[in-house]
Amino acid sequence: MLLKHFPHDEKPRERFIKYGPSSLSNHELVAILLRTGTKKESVLQISARLLQTFGGLRSVREATIEEMSKIRGVGKAKAISLLAALELGTRLHHQTTDNRYVIRTPEDGANFVMEDMRFLTQENFVCLYLNTKNQVLHKHTVFIGSLNSSIVHPREIFKEAFKRSAASFICVHNHPSGDPTPSREDIEVTQRLFECGKLIGIQLLDHLVIGDQKFVSLKEKGYL
């Protein structure tokens, strides 16, 4: 059956959008990369036949453009697109956690963000999400503007932490004045997030206030 005859909700792209990539089979993901079928075969049929011919994704990854182009309905352009996607997956796999930045001290955290944040003209509130080895998994800008406890919603911060499977996190924000002395709001936000982290089990390790080539650690100041 041609893809246009499939119910809308059963088409790979629509299922990808609705349920996410993990809900699709290998041949459905390959079909998305191949994009189109022929007059006689749907792209899903071509995808399934391609995987069957080579015996699975691993063998497809090792195939040449010429070998893949021999599959009816594929051609060089589709072969290149598929091999490029598989190569990206291979490269991502080889990027081990050993290459991630490690934060062991407040200085490590400040060095990670200083050059990006010291000259910002507005306050940026950023979270650094870490794994169990204190390696940075993700840097996320929570909001831009004056820091206020009513604006910083723990829900948004911990939602991102769960998404990244973080074990802990560090909050960072800048003072455009260049003076990193923490304000009352800075301290209140820090203590609120620290208490939430204790309940949820994702620890706030520190809150760094960035100035011009200097910073303050609220942990070192005794607020955590």
From Swiss-Prot:
Sequence motif JAMM motif, location on chain: 173-186
Gene3D superfamilies in the record: 5' to 3' exonuclease, C-terminal subdomain (1.10.150.20), Cytidine Deaminase, domain 2 (3.40.140.10)
Residues the record lists as binding Zn(2+): 173, 175, 186
Biological process annotations from GO: proteolysis
Molecular functions per Gene Ontology: metal ion binding; metallopeptidase activity
Xref: PANTHER family: DNA REPAIR PROTEIN RADC, UPF0758 PROTEIN YEES-RELATED
Keyword tags: Hydrolase, Metal-binding, Metalloprotease, Protease, Zinc
Family from the record: Belongs to the UPF0758 family.
Name used for this protein in its record: UPF0758 protein BPUM_2444
Database matches in NCBIfam families: PRK00024.1, radc
Organism: Bacillus pumilus (strain SAFR-032)
Residue ranges of domain MPN in the record: 102-224
